[in-house]
Design a protein with these regions (language model features):
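Short, low-complexity, intrinsically disordered N-terminal peptides in bacterial proteins
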Residues: 1-7, 78-81
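A generic structural signal for short, non-catalytic loop/turn and secondary-structure boundary residues
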Residues: 4, 28, 69-70
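Amphipathic, hydrophobic secondary-structure cores in small proteins
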Residues: 7-62
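C-terminal structural segments of small proteins and small subunits
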Residues: 54-81
Length: 81
């Protein structure tokens, strides 16, 4: 059986502190997703990224902006399911 690649929203961070702050924020607000190792398609500093469904982009970025939280890159990439 071949594993399928599906679109995923990935928010990458420059520092581990930024990643942990975002994870804490998203969890506290009940926003979907999880922390993953940064995919090879993205180049950013700390090696951690938040993965969620692409349709969650606006909610996640709005939460980061409202909290004044920093992130390096936000893009949709194809990841193995």
């Amino acid at each position: 059986m071949t594993r399928q690649r599906v679109p995923a929203l990935v928010i990458a961070f420059d520092t581990t502190a930024q990643a942990i702050a975002a994870e804490t924020l998203f969890t506290a607000q009940g926003l979907p997703g999880r922390m993953i190792p940064i995919p090879s398609q993205i180049s950013a500093g700390c090696g951690l990224a938040w993965k969620a469904a692409p349709e969650q982009r606006q909610a996640l970025l709005s939460a980061l902006d409202a909290a004044g939280a920093a992130y390096a890159v936000c893009q949709t990439v194809l990841l193995l399911r």
